[in-house]
Amino acid sequence: MALSMPLNGLKEEDKEPLIELFVKAGSDGESIGNCPFSQRLFMILWLKGVVFSVSTVDLKRKPADLQNLAPGTHPPFITFNSEVKTDVNKIEEFLEEVLCPPKYLKLSPKHPESNTAGMDIFAKFSAYIKNSRPEANEALERGLLKTLQKLDEYLNSPLPDEIDENSMEDIKFSTRKFLDGDEMTLADCNLLPKLHIVKVVAKKYRNFDIPKEMTGIWRYLTNAYSRDEFTNTCPSDKEVEIAYSDVAKRLTK
């Protein structure tokens, strides 16, 4: 029977795991590229407070050692103590399970609704930005606005723990910073990278702005842009625009 011996007096469970994250590289082959799934995992690991390394992968010229490590796999993926994991949803579940309290933060939302808030936005945005028919533009824009409005309403609606049943004050609007409260959760790691893409690309290729009246969304984005976990894992606006230069269709009659 093999025994797992403690190293340097550390028990097995006390050792820091060896984690490497591989993300899509930008157009220069080195910087962070446009990939909401890469940013999602990058944010999760950062928020967990675990030590990890990040490598950008140039999809135009995959290095041979990467082909050997994860043949046929596109980033993002991770190696966790040398074990390769490639499915983003399963990686999220795995990290939440193994990087757990008391040593690491729990990132699952307390309110199930936070997981699904804004889930339709990216699909509506994709249909809007890929459309080339002027006569369809207005209806597709309305569809996008409707999903944004739904998210805005969720962000402005007080969560149960914002309401004090013993208080005489009637709280009509939420003041929370993120989807599930004042701290980021897995739900934010999923939605924020996509919402940022929508903001940047729709402005560049459709001159569309998220309406200022959507105060919940703007409060949400402003709070996200004040956090290193988001801004330091985010591709530059130029990278996002480059990524969509062939995807965004011109409206032609």
UniProtKB/Swiss-Prot annotation:
The modification N6-acetyllysine is found at K24, K130. CDD domains: GST_C_CLIC4, GST_N_CLIC. Keywords: Acetylation, Cell junction, Cell membrane, Chloride, Chloride channel, Cytoplasm, Cytoplasmic vesicle, Cytoskeleton, Ion channel, Ion transport, Membrane, Mitochondrion, Nucleus, Oxidoreductase, Phosphoprotein, Transmembrane, Transmembrane helix, Transport, Voltage-gated channel. The chain crosses the membrane at residues 37-57. Its EC number is 1.8.-.-. The modification Phosphoserine is found at S4, S132, S167, S236. SUPFAM superfamilies: GST C-terminal domain-like, Thioredoxin-like. It is found in: Cytoplasm, Cytoskeleton, Microtubule organizing center, Centrosome; Cytoplasmic vesicle membrane; Nucleus; Cell membrane. It comes from the Eukaryota. The modification Phosphotyrosine is found at Y244. GO terms for molecular function: chloride channel activity; oxidoreductase activity. One of its GO terms (cellular component) is cytoplasmic vesicle membrane. The active G-site contains a monothiol Cys-X-X-Ser motif which mediates glutathione-dependent redox catalysis. Monomer. Interacts with HRH3. In the soluble state, catalyzes glutaredoxin-like thiol disulfide exchange reactions with reduced glutathione as electron donor. Can insert into membranes and form voltage-dependent multi-ion conductive channels. Membrane insertion seems to be redox-regulated and may occur only under oxidizing conditions. Has alternate cellular functions like a potential role in angiogenesis or in maintaining apical-basolateral membrane polarity during mitosis and cytokinesis. Could also promote endothelial cell proliferation and regulate endothelial morphogenesis (tubulogenesis). This is Chloride intracellular channel protein 4. The gene is CLIC4.
